[in-house]
Amino acid sequence: MTKSDLLFDKFNDKHGKFLVFFGTFVDTPKLGELRIREKTSVGVLNGIIRFVNRNSLDPVKDCLDHDSSLSPEDVTVVDIIGKDKTRNNSFYFPGFVDTHNHVSQYPNVGVFGNSTLLDWLEKYTFPIEAALANENIAREVYNKVISKTLSHGTTTVAYYNTIDLKSTKLLAQLSSLLGQRVLVGKVCMDTNGPEYYIEDTKTSFESTVKVVKYIRETICDPLVNPIVTPRFAPSCSRELMQQLSKLVKDENIHVQTHLSENKEEIQWVQDLFPECESYTDVYDKYGLLTEKTVLAHCIHLTDAEARVIKQRRCGISHCPISNSSLTSGECRVRWLLDQGIKVGLGTDVSAGHSCSILTTGRQAFAVSRHLAMRETDHAKLSVSECLFLATMGGAQVLRMDETLGTFDVGKQFDAQMIDTNAPGSNVDMFHWQLKEKDQMQEQEQEQGQDPYKNPPLLTNEDIIAKWFFNGDDRNTTKVWVAGQQVYQI
């Protein structure tokens, strides 16, 4: 049994067949809405949420009321409140969704010098991706990235791998073994690559078909699905894009690629594809824009391009860390949302220097503030909006919002347990800031007489904000994917 086998087996609960999670549940069902449900029980069977009871007095009874054929022995309760049922500042939050992660580039995290996109690809990116044709190197990197993203609460990831067929199959294997929900893509590039890292058109297409078949027929795991991955327009011939488009439509597969990341890149695309009206039009003309297409970056879109993306119902992966690191620009997220375009968050490792979607969300918050400084306050994103992008927004981009993103009946239970008081936590709160509602009311009455007598108390929204700005993987104590525990601190 491998180390990965042990890791996966260790955390899978084999007690009662019906799981009931009890405590405070926080999610964002709509953009701008932060839903907080205290003392709530959520029943999960076979990975699916079967009931949600607010103000629960007895989680086991809730389960037996839901299904009278059950006995107490059939029920396992995960309780983060404790016997005294007092406020402890732990809560369940939906698993994060990373819509853009170059898993193969992880060894280069933090290494980009003073480069911008195109020279960064040549100097740093292509060499490290080529190195992962070595299975031993690839296995070490993939195990690290999957484990690390899970430890940061990321339950769903769209992975870009490399042009190598064997290592892409390995990535799918390890993702299934470790229990992460993933889209796995073999990068396609048959033009404008270095001699040591490029494919011919036939090999690129046929290896993609093999990956799709391998994932669907050999891995055969509902958590692991293929995604067609033309790197970006400059690295793909017209013939290759047309072949990939037919595959996507025939097999109903996701697509992921890059769009409008860098001004020099945009000019290059215009030079390479003079028959197309814009960068977006290249993908549209060659059939790669579908409702299951994920477009990373989209910083410098024109109004016309945004209209096409909306019409084709594509989703956009906002990658604020890498956009800043490579000085690519600031994506106008509010502008996209106002047009009804789906937006999620992407770590974009390795130009993005963190595997954490929470860190990425903080950067999205900051970038929106910088945009507002030269535009209007309307460009600002709130904490709840950034958390929406990190969960439900990402699920929408990946066309998984009917099954992921919130704690609602019928959805998969992809979740993380957050403990703001975890050992070493960077989220500092003082006991006198934290009291029950009746104590808060008493204090408010006292403050009415003397506003300086007692310090202000933290609301639930305040606690979520402190976690958003100061939290990290130390606060993510457990993680579940489809009801199976896949990580424990």
From Swiss-Prot:
Enzymatic class: hydrolase
Alphabetical list of InterPro entries matching this protein: Amidohydro-rel (IPR006680), Guanine_deaminase (IPR014311), Metal-dep_hydrolase_composite (IPR011059), Metal_Hydrolase (IPR032466), Metallo-dep_hydrolases (IPR051607)
Catalysed reaction equations from the record: guanine + H2O + H(+) = xanthine + NH4(+)
Any one cellular-component term (Gene Ontology): cytosol
Single GO MF descriptor: guanine deaminase activity
TM helices/strands, residue ranges: none
UniProt binding sites for Zn(2+): H100, H102, H258, D348
Annotated S-S bridges: none
Cofactor note: Binds 1 zinc ion per subunit.
One annotated GO biological process: guanine metabolic process
The protein's required cofactors: Zn(2+)
Subcellular location: Cytoplasm
Pathway: Purine metabolism; guanine degradation; xanthine from guanine: step 1/1
Binding sites annotated in the UniProt record for substrate: H102, V103, S104, Q105, R231, F232, H258, L259, S260, E261, D348
Location (main, coarse): cytoplasm
Misc. comment: Present with 279 molecules/cell in log phase SD medium.
Purpose: Catalyzes the hydrolytic deamination of guanine, producing xanthine and ammonia.
Family: Belongs to the metallo-dependent hydrolases superfamily. ATZ/TRZ family.
Protein name: Probable guanine deaminase
Record organism: Saccharomyces cerevisiae (strain ATCC 204508 / S288c) (Baker's yeast)
Gene of this entry: GUD1
